[in-house]
Regions:
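TPR-adjacent "capping" and linker segments in tetratricopeptide-repeat scaffold/adaptor proteins
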Residues: 23-38, 169-176
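Residue-level recognition of tetratricopeptide repeat
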Residues: 44, 78, 112, 146, ...
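TPR alpha-solenoid repeat register
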Residues: 9-13, 72, 106, 140, ...
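Register position in tetratricopeptide repeats
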Residues: 48, 82, 116-117, 150, ...
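Canonical tetratricopeptide repeat
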Residues: 12, 16, 41, 75, ...
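Structural marker of alpha-solenoid helical repeat scaffolds
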Residues: 3-6, 65, 98-100, 132-134, ...
Length: 338
């Protein structure tokens, strides 16, 4: 889960607080620096548009014109990470000055890249060393929480989220992503009661956020509770993001759970077109099965095996394919397989 960063204070305030001079701040003092800044801004725009290769060219020109530019180093690192060249990405993240305006972002990006290259222990060891130097910056704690979540260590992830909340003196609007992401960790860690409270708190700040509406609505549907409200929430999310395959999957699965299997098939077929995901394809197979289209259902279950299904899901799929078990009907459905 990657959400907007929460800064207890900006890097500029950190520099002032520690009485440090940012010797590498991008000061436009001559024509060469000015041209470098133009190329850097253009590179940032291209990168945000997903044009990585073009962005790389512009960022390299910017760095050539203004050597030792931390902003250029940081952007080059992000670009190389985006094109899966993690080794080069690390080289650039490491070049960022200790008291630069992008220091914290570069440190976090470095930790995330180390995770991809060497795993959890290396990344958390790096972060432990860094966060002790910046005890007031909760973004380091949040990154720890996210990395443990990514490693399926939900208990440890929750511990870091709890530590973050203890450090926040006053809850504000900007903290809503923390309630959302910690809610997901709690839900995955089988602590639904606390998770639900986190989602509901997030909704108090962002009542129409499609991510929160979808996750909470899907969870309610899956548990067979608050069905009508959950369906309204997912419909709201789907209207906002009609091209989000995961949200459309939630809508299809909601119809499945209330026994509207034909409506489920329509939406799940659309979801599969938008994103190839083993869980979504499995959902489609189940909906087809209860719509009386059993041959098509088996085809979809077999297809789901081709899309990086977890070991648990593989067992479920194989049992359904071999006829050793049947899919479960919707939790609030009264219809039976046709």
């Amino acid at each position: 889960i990657k959400l907007e960063k929460i800064d207890p204070y900006s890097n500029e305030l950190f520099i002032l607080k520690n009485n440090k001079t940012n010797k590498r701040k991008n000061n436009v003092s001559n024509i060469r620096d000015g041209i470098s800044e133009v190329f850097l801004n253009s590179a940032e725009i291209l990168f945000n548009e997903g044009l990585d290769r073009q962005a790389l060219i512009y960022a390299q020109i910017s760095s050539y014109l203004a050597p030792n530019s931390d902003s250029s180093y940081y952007l080059l690192g992000r670009i190389f990470k985006s094109i899966n060249n993690n080794e080069r990405a690390l080289e650039y993240f490491k070049k960022v000055n200790e008291y630069s305006l992008v220091t914290h972002d570069a440190n976090i990006a470095y930790a995330e890249t180390i995770y991809d290259l060497k795993g959890l222990n290396s990344s958390t060891q790096f972060l432990n060393n860094i966060k002790n130097s910046f005890p007031d910056n909760i973004n380091y704690l949040r990154t720890m929480a996210e990395l443990f979540y990514k490693a399926d260590n939900f208990k440890k992830s929750i511990e870091y989220y709890d530590l973050i909340f203890k450090k926040i003196e006053k809850i504000e609007f900007k903290h809503w992503p923390l309630f959302y992401s910690s809610g997901i960790a709690l839900e995955r860690g089988k602590n639904w009661e606390r998770a639900e409270k986190q989602f509901l708190t997030a909704l108090q700040f962002v009542p129409n956020n499609p991510q929160v509406l979808n996750y909470l609505g899907y969870s309610w549907i899956d548990k067979g509770i608050n069905i009508n409200e959950a369906l309204e929430m997912i419909v709201n999310a789907a209207e906002q993001r009609p091209d989000d395959g995961y949200i459309i999957d939630s809508l299809g699965w909601a119809y499945y759970q209330i026994g509207k299997y034909e409506d489920a098939v329509i939406n799940l077929e659309k979801a599969v077109e938008l994103v190839s995901d083993s869980v979504i394809i499995d959902h489609l197979g189940d909906a087809l099965f209860f719509s009386g289209r059993k041959i098509e259902a088996v085809f979809q279950w077999k297809r789901a095996l081709e899309f990086n299904a977890s070991d648990e899901l593989k067992n479920i799929l194989n049992n359904k394919i071999n006829g050793d078990s049947l899919p479960k009907p919707g939790v609030n459905a009264v219809s039976k397989p046709i």
